């Protein structure tokens, strides 16, 4: 199992260094030299010429900041259009629970040229910052700048976090997605200050100007789009990686959420992924198998830009959840009854606009140990863990985006609203059977069973050395701890204290061994699965939950075996 770094790689939308092949003009050739020099430095630790390289890159950065790509005046002129205070609804009585975005609208760069330019500036800035940090550490005799961890920490500095946050927020799309993924890592994976800075990316992405908003609404719903609503709030209540969300009231009086896709995002996914790879190659070793994850990530993100597909996923998920709750035969009612999926308003939904029932509540990123008691936090964690296991072993269909804002707690009605079904996938029964067997091996502390089913799943080839086999077995043992009665008994536990056990940190300690000894990439299905499971564990850890996870696991395990054919 690839651990936390592999989880990042799998969702970071990296790949081959295609930036180099795209570079044709002088600026791009210079950037190519920059990337090659940076990779050479990172791989060979050629500290003799470090100061000279840093000076060259500083000059390049200054030069790039003075240049401007003219692209028919389409995107590079960042006109800052301020949202009007029009006669939109709720201007006089806005919901205080919601954070309306009244900042300047930033025009999103939508052409390939303008987005390439943004990535080039970011790469140069991050690279110059990296070399500056390496130079400082080389001069400091107390620092061992030749170590891999030194290169890693030289990338993840506060200054580079600020660069990424600003750039990702401006570009949205795949770029902003990586910022959001980085922002929900725990402190065992990234420096706390780095996570804190990038958390702004997740919470405060820039909205688009009204001009772009109105153009999209007109293109998708017609020039008379406002006539399809009683009221429409121009100020978005959320701005994320692919689109932003507005409140509205339909003609029949329903309060709805209207998600509007950013212009050009769908067309930029592939090139964005290729451009991001140039940044990842500074820190990611070859054995991380970026190439394998690239196509999966690209396909997943492209599906997220199709809101008709998301509407279909949401309706399917709603049907599966309600059928399970209402069946009354398998006992899932008590595990899933407090979960809710909003309705979809299909007549106001297109490929670029998604309209759904508006739900109220507090996203789980705002739930803290200071403002909610243990019982409430445990209730939330039980629901999130039950949902994750139901998706795998009962529905065989999973929403794989663990963004904390996708879970909204409605305390008044005591339910958790589930949002954002753009990233979903089905799992075949054969894969789930082998995966469950490997987890059961961990639950029963059976190393042979873990390795047997790791081989069947495709984690191993059978030719791995003892170090790799041991690391694989340990990762499964750690992952399965919350579900193991034997582990509870051995450690005198009645419930599993997620925060104390630090699952992510312990698995991350196995990463160097795996990256050094791995012979093949992890199975493709686990990229998204482990992103979701990791997110689930992080929620339980953040809330300092103490729950009997064995009961939940055994329930959904039994459902799977009952239905398995």
Curated annotation (Swiss-Prot):
PANTHER family: COENZYME Q8 (PTHR43851:SF3), PTHR43851. Its EC number is 2.7.11.-. It holds the Pfam family ABC1. This is Probable serine/threonine-protein kinase abkA. Belongs to the protein kinase superfamily. ADCK protein kinase family. The lineage of its organism: Eukaryota, Amoebozoa, Evosea, Eumycetozoa, Dictyostelia. CDD domains: ABC1_ADCK3. ATP binds at residues 237-245, 259. It is an enzyme of class 2 (transferase). It comes from Dictyostelium discoideum (Social amoeba). Residues 231-565 form the Protein kinase domain. InterPro entries: ABC1_dom, ADCK3_dom, Atypical_kinase_ADCK, Kinase-like_dom_sf, Prot_kinase_dom. Keywords: ATP-binding, Coiled coil, Kinase, Nucleotide-binding, Serine/threonine-protein kinase, Transferase. Residues 44-77 form a coiled coil. The keyword Nucleotide-binding applies. GO terms for biological process: ubiquinone biosynthetic process. GO terms for molecular function: ATP binding; protein serine/threonine kinase activity. PROSITE patterns: PROTEIN_KINASE_DOM. The active site is at 401 (proton acceptor). The keyword Transferase applies.
